[in-house]
Amino acid sequence: MNLGTRYSPEQIEKKWYERWVEKGYFAPKGSGIPFVIVIPPPNITGRIHMGHALNITLQDILVRYKRMRGFDTLWVPGEDHAGIATQNAVERYLESQGKSREQLGREKFIEIVWEWAKKYRKEIRQQIETLGASVDWSRERFTLDDGLSKAVRKVFVDLYNRGLIYRGKYMVNWCPRCQTVLSDEEVEHIEESAKLYYVKYPFSGSNEYIVIATTRPETMLGDVAVAVNPEDERYKNISGKTVVLPLMNREIPIITDSYVDPEFGTGAVKITPAHDPNDFDIAKRHSLQFIEIFDNEAKINENGGKYAGLDRYQARKAVLEDLEKAGFLLKVENINHAVGHCYRCDSVIEPRIMDQWFVSMKSLSKRAIEAVENEEIRFVPERWKKVYLHWMYNIRDWCISRQLWWGHRVPVWYCKNCNETIVSEIDIEECPKCGSKSIEQDEDVLDTWFSSALWPFSTLGWPEKTEDLEKYYPTSVLVTGFDIIFFWVARMIIMGYQFMQKKPFTDVYIHQLIRDKHGRKMSKSLGNGIDPIDMSEKYGTDPVRFTLAIFAAQGSDIKLDERYFDTYRKFANKIWNAARFVLINLDNYKPQPLNELSLADRWILSKLQKVISVVSDAIEKYEFNIAARSLYEFFWNEFCDWYIESSKLVLNSEKKAITQNVLVKVLDTSLRLLHPFMPFLSEELWQNLPVHGESIVISDWPEVDVTLINEEAEKNFEKLVQIIRGIRNVKAEMNIPPKRNTKVYIYGETLCKEESSYIEHLSGAQISYVKEKPACCATAFVSENQHVYVDVAGLNLQSEIKRLMKNIEKLQKEREWQLKKLSDDKFLSNAPEEAISEARQKLSEIEDRLKILNQILGDLM
C-alpha cells in the first residue's frame, strides 16, 4: 500500500493531471459511438468564476462517464475573444498606466490586446486544468484564431450574398461609455424610480396649451410632433393643429396614432424619433423629420441650441430649470419604469439612429424553431423550451456591427474612387470595378456572438471538410447557463442548420445560477464571490466538484456557502480512510469467486447494484445531484458505517478471504462510480487496489449484475440495522457507554448465530431470549414477531425518569420552534435551500428522538 495517513489533494492532483495528458487519455480513441461537447468558451477578461466551475464540472462528469462507457469522447476546449468586455478591460489597464486607446492608435492597441489574450488564455487553461477537466488540449480553439476568422468571413459573405446581411440606418442601442452599438439582447432592463414631468406645449397663436408627460425632458430639444390616440375623445378636434415647442420656439404638428396609450400621463406624448424606438416607428408612419440631439458621448450637439455641450443629465437639469422659469412645467410625479443599461459597463443606453450592419433573422429562425418544437433538439429542464420559443417567435433583426477595435473586422471594403462596396472573404487591395487602390475597410468589428454562433462546427475545422467535422458533428450536448440562451444557444442552432444542414447538438442542459448563501447573485460590487481556484487550493478540487454536483438540482439556483466545501472535504477523507482500511486488511488476498456469502456480503452487493443503476440513470438524465447524493449515502452510510464495521468480525478469522474480495469489489466499483465526480482521489486510490488496469480514466463503467440483487438479504440486514440502532439509541439516552457490554433481551423470533453476532459486535450487546418482557428494561425494537429490550437494572430509575421528562420538555420546545420556522414564508423564500433542508432534517431528528424518549419513559414508569 502506498497511501499516506491523510488525504492531501495538493500532492496528487497535479501529478495525475499531467499523467493523463501525457498518456493521451483525453483525446478521442477513434472508435465507438461519438460523444462530443464543445466547451462554452470563457472570456479572456480574467479568472474563471464559480459559474464556470459548475459548468466545467458538469461537462466533465458527462465526458468521463461516457468515456468509461466506451464512447468515442471528444471535449473541445477554447476561449472567447469577448470583444467589448476585453476591450473595456484593456482600456482600464491602460488608464491605470496613464495611457488611452486613442493615444496608441488602432494597430498598437490591437498588439497590446493580443498580448493580453495570450496571457489570459494561458491562465484560463491552467484554471481549467486545476478543475480536472478532461478536455483534448490538442484541439484548443480561440474565437479569433485563423480558422475561426476564415469561418466568420465565409458566413458573412454567404449571408450577404443571399440578402440576409444588410446595412441600414435604424434605431439602435448606443452605449456612451463603451462607444459602441449593442444588440437588443445586450441591453439589461432594470426597474428604477424616476420622475414623470408634465409640460405645457402652447398652441400656435393661442394662449391655450396641451400637456404632455415625459420622463426625459432633455429630449424635447429633438421633438418633431405631439401625438394622441385617434380614439381619445379629449383630443378629437386638435389633430392637424400645431404647437410651439417650448424653449426651442419651433412649430410642430399634432398627429394621431393608435400606438399612443390614452392611460399614460395625459394621453398626449412628445415624439422624438431620433432617440426613442417607438417614436421612430411613429415618425416613419407619418413621414416626420428626424432631429438628432446627442453625440457619441451622449452630450447635446449643435441641434440643441444653447444646451450644446451639456451631457444628458446636465441638460435635463438645465431644461427643467428653464421650463419652470418660463411657466411650462406644470407638475412632477414619482413613477417606476424600466431603463436599459449596457450589460458590460452598466451605463444607461441611448437609442440612436445609425448606419449599422444587420442580420435578417425571421427567415433564418424557422428551422431553429421547428427543431425545438418537434424535440429534435431537447431542452433540460423542459421549461427552458418555452423561454427559447417565446424569444424565437418574436425575433428581431440582429445588429452585428460594433464600434470597437478588438474583434473580427467587418469584411467589407469601400472604394473611394467609384464608391463601390466590396464584400469579400479575402483582403481587398484593389477595387474590382475601377482598379483603384484607394480602398478602405469598414472600421467596425462584428458582435462577439457572431463568431460564437459558429462554435460547434468551426471548432471542428469548418469551412474545410475535415475528418473531425465529418465524425464529430453534430455534437451531443451543450451545457450552459440560462442567461445566454438568446445570445448564444439560439444563434448556434440557427447557424448550424444554415451552414451544416444539421442541428449543432441534441440536448441543451441549462444549469443553475450560483448565488451566495443569502440568495444574492455573486458580483464584484457586492464582494460576495467565491473563487473556485482558491477553494480548490484550500479544500481540494474533488470536494469542490462534488459540492457543485450535489447541489446541481434541476430547476433551482444554488445558494453556496463555503462551509459546504468543508463538508465534502470530510467526505473525501472518509473515502480515503475507508480505502486505507481495505488495503491494510488485504494480507494474503487472492481474487476468487463470490461464493458462500454472508448476510452482510449479500446485502452490500445488492445495494451496490442499485447504486450503480441509480447513478447511471441520473447522469443520463442530467440529474447530477441525485447521482452525487446516492453515491454519498451509499459510501458513507452503507459501506463505511455498516459493511466495513461488520467486516471487522470476519477479517481476523479463517473466513476473511470472501470478505476481502467483497471489500475490494465494492471499493473498486465505488471508485469507478465516483470517478466522474472526484477524478483525482478515485485515481489515486484505484491505483493502490489489487485490480488490473492502466488508469481508472479508461476503465469500464460498472454494470449492474442482476444475480447479485437480493431483496431478502436487504430486508433481513436492514432489520438488524434497526435493532442495532434501537439498542444504541437506548444506551445513548440512558447514558450507558457505547462499548459497555449490556444485556439485551429478545422476545419472539430467534435470530440465527450470524445475526446475533452482528448485533453483539455492533451494539455492545449480550443477547438472551425471554418468553415475556423482563422488568427494568427499555424497548429498543418492536416488530410483528419480535421485541428487543435493553436491560437498565442498576440505574437510578427515578433520577433517569426525571432526566428523561426534562429532555422531552426541552425537545418539545425545540420542535415547536422548528415548526414555526418551517411555516414562516419569509424563511422559506429567502433562506438557502441547504438551510431549509437542515431545518427539516433537524425537525425529523427531534421527532425521532421524542419517539424514543417517550417509549423509554413509558417502559420505566
Swiss-Prot record:
Its EC number is 6.1.1.9. One of its GO terms (molecular function) is aminoacyl-tRNA deacylase activity. A motif ('KMSKS' region) lies at residues 521-525. PROSITE patterns: AA_TRNA_LIGASE_I. GO terms for cellular component: cytosol. Keywords: Aminoacyl-tRNA synthetase, ATP-binding, Coiled coil, Cytoplasm, Ligase, Nucleotide-binding, Protein biosynthesis. A motif ('HIGH' region) lies at residues 42-52. It comes from the Bacteria. Pfam families: Anticodon_1, tRNA-synt_1, Val_tRNA-synt_C. Residues 792-861 form a coiled coil. ValRS has two distinct active sites: one for aminoacylation and one for editing. The misactivated threonine is translocated from the active site to the editing site. Monomer. This is Valine--tRNA ligase. It comes from Pseudothermotoga lettingae (strain ATCC BAA-301 / DSM 14385 / NBRC 107922 / TMO) (Thermotoga lettingae). The gene is valS.
